[in-house]
């Protein structure tokens, strides 16, 4: 008798498939990574696995939101309201040094029903990570975990 409700364990340990399936099944929602560690090839692999699960993958350029009416109309809000499983890659994360934008992102990711969304903030460097996610006064303080970069 198998009491394990999860299916990700049918994939071999250390594989990208097990990792992505596990993130969805375990409800792990917000990640960060670095452009020099998670390049286009690895992102494409993660996108292919997500697509195989019926999950759409999109890229949102956070710099494109600066100065826009992002609070009332944005691709992020469309994704949240659609309830369609989606993996979002946030790029140009330096925009999150703007506390207003960062606070709004934190707010929508924590107050709306976002169980159908997984987000990855693609950062340029460790300093950017420290300023956005490790500064106690920053809106996104300690709100992510490192995206695992399985080398399968």
Segments from the language model and where they lie:
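Catalytic-core regions built around general acid/base machinery
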Residues: 104-112, 135-139
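Extended, compositionally biased accessory segments flanking or bridging domains
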Residues: 1-85
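Short, well-ordered coil/turn elements that cap or connect secondary structure elements
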Residues: 52, 114, 139-142
């Amino acid at each position: 008798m198998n009491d394990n409700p999860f299916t990700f364990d049918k994939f071999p340990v250390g594989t990208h498939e097990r990792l992505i399936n596990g993130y969805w099944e375990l409800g792990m929602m917000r990640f960060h990574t670095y452009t020099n560690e998670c390049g286009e090839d690895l992102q494409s692999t993660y996108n292919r696995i997500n697509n195989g699960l019926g999950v759409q993958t999109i890229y949102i350029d956070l710099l494109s939101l600066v100065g826009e009416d992002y609070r009332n109309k944005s691709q992020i809000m469309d994704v949240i309201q659609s309830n369609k499983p989606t993996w979002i890659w946030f790029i140009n994360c330096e925009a999150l040094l703007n506390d207003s934008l960062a606070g709004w992102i934190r707010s929508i990711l924590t107050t709306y029903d976002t169980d159908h969304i997984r987000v990855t903030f693609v950062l340029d460097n460790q300093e950017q990570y420290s300023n956005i996610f490790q500064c106690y006064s920053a809106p996104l303080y300690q709100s992510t975990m490192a995206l695992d970069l399985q080398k399968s």
